């Protein structure tokens, strides 16, 4: 309940905010629904890796508060990924019927990955159950699977990012296998792709566009709406399920952590032409300010 409420409440707050800013700041060729959905999803995600790091540094990993916060963030991220997939399918479709087709094919693809690909990968996981090292051929195969899955979802009308995510989800549940593969993937992604992504995002962000007081006011509104939606949704739902007011306040603050995933959502919206350069700059600035404030509070 906490995870879904803390995702859905800021999502609708974001859509409501989009209603008031659409006429003035959105591209006239962009449908309102696509614009509102992207603003909503960008405000509704909790940065799970950032939250996990904060909980670890504060020594809350094995506490009741830390467990609830991490579980809520993990479930909320899954909800956000599903919402993002639907949002992209709707935004890329020319009509509602096309959006339904995109969503239907995407569901079929997910079913195929879980019913056909996952059992095959589980067999591989059993083979490497007690091994400390994975051979290069298997590593190459896993990378090929990630790329293929990303390419197929791009064809189906979703973003390539979603396909890579699904490929990661269907990996064998073997903890040792996942740990080794995570290290292999991170060797490439953290050292090469992530810095390039930040460079690309920095080049896209035109802070100079924020040259009017009204845009800075819009940035402040985004910050307030995002914090209020996330904090309120998490806090009141935590209180509803029986948590104390103190723990509910802590959960609301912890669920307000922001990070890379929000930036990915904004970048996708910008690449698809749904977010204008000025809205992207405002959203990026609000994200950085929100992330800094949340980390200081936590």
Predicted regions and their residues:
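The feature identifies polytopic integral membrane transport proteins across all domains of life
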Residues: 1-5, 26-43, 53-74, 180, ...
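Hydrophobic alpha-helical transmembrane segments in multi-pass integral membrane proteins
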Residues: 14-18, 81-86, 146-158, 197-209, ...
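Conserved small/polar residues in nucleotide/adenosyl-binding loops
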Residues: 285-292
């Amino acid at each position: 309940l906490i995870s879904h409420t803390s995702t859905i409440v800021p999502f609708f707050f974001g859509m409501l905010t989009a209603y008031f800013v659409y006429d003035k700041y959105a591209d006239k060729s962009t449908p309102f629904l696509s614009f509102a959905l992207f603003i909503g999803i960008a405000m509704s995600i909790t940065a799970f890796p950032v939250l996990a790091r904060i909980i670890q540094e504060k020594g809350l990993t094995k506490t009741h508060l830390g467990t609830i916060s991490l579980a809520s963030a993990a479930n909320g991220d899954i909800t956000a990924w599903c919402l993002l997939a639907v949002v992209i399918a709707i935004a890329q479709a020319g009509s509602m019927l096309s959006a339904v087709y995109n969503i239907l094919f995407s569901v079929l693809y997910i079913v195929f990955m879980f019913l056909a690909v996952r059992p095959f990968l589980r067999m591989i996981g059993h083979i490497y159950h007690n091994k400390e090292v994975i051979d290069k051929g298997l590593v190459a195969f896993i990378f090929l699977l990630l790329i293929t899955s990303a390419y197929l979802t791009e064809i189906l009308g979703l973003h390539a990012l979603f396909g890579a995510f699904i490929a990661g989800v269907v990996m064998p549940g073997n903890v040792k296998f996942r740990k080794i593969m995570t290290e292999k993937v991170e060797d490439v992604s953290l050292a090469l792709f992530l810095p390039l992504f930040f460079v690309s995002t920095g080049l896209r962000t035109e802070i100079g566009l924020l040259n009017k007081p009204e845009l800075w006011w819009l940035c402040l509104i985004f910050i307030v709406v995002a914090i209020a939606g996330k904090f309120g949704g998490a806090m009141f739902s935590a209180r509803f399920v029986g948590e104390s007011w103190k723990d509910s306040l802590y959960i609301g603050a912890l669920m307000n952590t922001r990070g890379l995933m929000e930036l990915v959502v904004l970048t996708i919206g910008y690449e698809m032409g749904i977010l204008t350069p000025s809205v992207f700059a405002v959203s990026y600035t609000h994200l950085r300010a929100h992330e800094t404030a949340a980390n200081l509070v936590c």
